[in-house]
């Protein structure tokens, strides 16, 4: 989590020993180049499908919400927002011992409703932009875990643009 991503956009190039969400997600970018042991193909296909779902958001606004050792020690939370689509993605990485963090999202329409989906827990909630900008709680059960969230302006809100 320490590198050029604080100054330049995500590159999507990495080498790793295992397919763990924490390591994989911290290296997503416009493209994906992997150096992996040939393991179960299904797992690799899942990683590629998840990265492809994230990819359109890398062309939007980038907000580093929490950086390790700042307001939430051990957490890094990044938001990529496509205001033109009313959608975005949030990556949360827990490297420390504090299993909870609050992330205040940016660039949302405070008066609109959004559907917030946590990929890891399969939970979806409807929440206002104002509430997401006031802070969404993020929880993991142990260090070196990540959470991936997608948000979409609700269909009725998007049709009223």
What are these regions (language model features)?
Residues 1-123:
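Active-site-proximal substrate-binding groove within the catalytic cores of carbohydrate-active enzymes
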Residues 127-161:
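C-terminal beta-strand-rich structural cap/linker in extracellular carbohydrate-active enzymes
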């Amino acid at each position: 989590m320490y590198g050029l991503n604080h100054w330049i956009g995500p590159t999507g190039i990495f080498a790793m020993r295992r397919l763990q969400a924490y390591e994989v997600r911290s290296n997503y970018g416009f493209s994906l180049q992997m150096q992996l042991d040939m393991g179960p193909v299904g797992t690799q296909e899942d990683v590629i499908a998840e990265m492809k779902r994230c990819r359109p958001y890398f062309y939007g606004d980038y907000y580093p919400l929490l950086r390790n050792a700042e307001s939430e020690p051990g957490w890094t939370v990044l938001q990529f927002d496509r205001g033109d689509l009313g959608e975005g993605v949030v990556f949360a990485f827990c490297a420390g011992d504090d299993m909870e963090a609050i992330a205040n999202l940016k660039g949302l329409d405070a008066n609109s409703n959004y559907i917030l989906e946590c990929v890891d827990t399969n939970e979806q909630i409807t929440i206002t932009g104002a509430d997401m900008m006031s802070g969404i709680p993020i929880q993991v059960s142990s260090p070196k875990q990540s959470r991936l969230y997608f948000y979409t302006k609700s269909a009725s809100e998007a049709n009223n643009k």
